[in-house]
């Protein structure tokens, strides 16, 4: 069963809903202010020169608006955007077919770009750098390289694992942007705008309540909004109010910190280890969960908000987590922290 606070997997129906709620201009796009400010400068400069925008890499946890920003860039540049994903490009021929169908100034958006195979990456290098496609025809001594000129295009890559990108690929992006978690105020504004598009007003305090439980992630906020709206409509309420909102979210198993059962299980597991670090593989086995899911979908929010810490030996629960569970922080850990920070000498 899909987690309500899951940020990686998106159903077809939900993806269509997200598209309908997607902002169409910079003023409608809330959050990521520094990125927006820089992008507007680069886009304006590119339009004045009548050149294709330089290649862009967006990285950071899932659900923070990488795809939405790419569509916005397409709108601002008044160009077409073609969307694909790393796992869908299995062979170099697949990428060659996509590239040769691009037109001057088009944007190619590749999600999960870190999952491209090395063979596909090799095709991408000259395409990004020289707008040229090198295709090998035949094999052995009779093999020939055919060079095909490509229109000047912009590649936008998105990844949740920037560290898995090869250096040659990473270096070919002219702009690198790290997506940040959203503040509660930013999410509340997103929720209010989205609720009106859904035909259901969400009151200010209810919007803030949803934002508090959305893990700093718009995708989660919009998903929770739709579910809270369901509860409200069943009761024939004209708007979403705070009491209904709290009731719905509690029923859905999302607590005031935005944690669900999976988060609680992870934190309880770390606490049960009596302060000793746990490796990722051990955690995954204990929770019967995939390592990638833990690393990409569960950990980022817990790390960013100080609930868990990564050490050279593994993951440990932080003081904040012990306080949340109303437990005493292990003395051995406190002593180790003091030694590390030089507080005892």
Curated annotation (Swiss-Prot):
Subunit field text: Homohexamer. Forms an RuvA(8)-RuvB(12)-Holliday junction (HJ) complex. HJ DNA is sandwiched between 2 RuvA tetramers; dsDNA enters through RuvA and exits via RuvB. An RuvB hexamer assembles on each DNA strand where it exits the tetramer. Each RuvB hexamer is contacted by two RuvA subunits (via domain III) on 2 adjacent RuvB subunits; this complex drives branch migration. In the full resolvosome a probable DNA-RuvA(4)-RuvB(12)-RuvC(2) complex forms which resolves the HJ.
Ranges where the record places region Small ATPAse domain (RuvB-S): 183-253
EC category name: hydrolase
Family stated for the protein in its record: Belongs to the RuvB family.
SUPFAM superfamilies to which the protein is assigned, alphabetical: P-loop containing nucleoside triphosphate hydrolases, Winged helix' DNA-binding domain
Subcellular location: Cytoplasm
Domain notes: Has 3 domains, the large (RuvB-L) and small ATPase (RuvB-S) domains and the C-terminal head (RuvB-H) domain. The head domain binds DNA, while the ATPase domains jointly bind ATP, ADP or are empty depending on the state of the subunit in the translocation cycle. During a single DNA translocation step the structure of each domain remains the same, but their relative positions change.
Gene name of the encoded protein: ruvB
EC numbers, comma separated: 3.6.4.-
GO cellular component: cytoplasm; Holliday junction resolvase complex
Domain of life, source organism: Bacteria
Function statement: The RuvA-RuvB-RuvC complex processes Holliday junction (HJ) DNA during genetic recombination and DNA repair, while the RuvA-RuvB complex plays an important role in the rescue of blocked DNA replication forks via replication fork reversal (RFR). RuvA specifically binds to HJ cruciform DNA, conferring on it an open structure. The RuvB hexamer acts as an ATP-dependent pump, pulling dsDNA into and through the RuvAB complex. RuvB forms 2 homohexamers on either side of HJ DNA bound by 1 or 2 RuvA tetramers; 4 subunits per hexamer contact DNA at a time.
Positions of the UniProt region annotated as Large ATPase domain (RuvB-L): 1-182
GO molecular function, one term: ATP binding
Protein name: Holliday junction branch migration complex subunit RuvB
One BP annotation, GO: DNA recombination
